[in-house]
């Protein structure tokens, strides 16, 4: 009798967990990895921001893609994935390799790659639960356009040190916003 009762209790608890929450809980290590990425981005700074004031530009970061009361956790994971993926791609270009120390870039790319692995796992879990793609097309497009503007800016400025400094600072802000979004969902859980 005891085994049947414990089986039913276990089944009830598992069902409640699936119903009461989203299927994906990013590990606490993911939050630590976010902080590591921000630290590494900070260490990439080679040029004083004050010497690049004339190069500043408003790239119109799509803050609404990372905020708003209508953004669900599953959609937020998709946006986080999109920001992380584009950050990885940006710092995997030849231009970034000529600007910064390769070992520091490798550490950054490794940290971003781990983030992508965690987020992809969560995306698969959420898509299985919801049965549909999670990212609103307008959020995805806004993030892609933002990173496209950064790429065009670098090309326009011929990948100058100040252009990379401006882009690095922009990416830090974007990544910081995405980290804050993730932390707000973690506090709600």
Curated annotation (Swiss-Prot):
The keyword Secreted applies. One of its GO terms (molecular function) is cytokine activity. GO terms for cellular component: extracellular space. Pfam families: Interferon. Disulfide bonds join 24-122, 52-162. The keyword Plastid does not apply. GO terms for biological process: adaptive immune response; B cell activation involved in immune response; defense response to virus; humoral immune response; natural killer cell activation involved in immune response; positive regulation of biosynthetic process; response to exogenous dsRNA; T cell activation involved in immune response. Gene3D superfamilies: 1.20.1250.10. Keywords: Antiviral defense, Cytokine, Disulfide bond, Secreted, Signal. Residues 1-23 form the signal peptide. It is found in: Secreted. Produced by macrophages, IFN-alpha have antiviral activities. Interferon stimulates the production of two enzymes: a protein kinase and an oligoadenylate synthetase. PANTHER family: INTERFERON ALPHA-5, TYPE I INTERFERON. Belongs to the alpha/beta interferon family. This is Interferon alpha-C. It comes from Bos taurus.
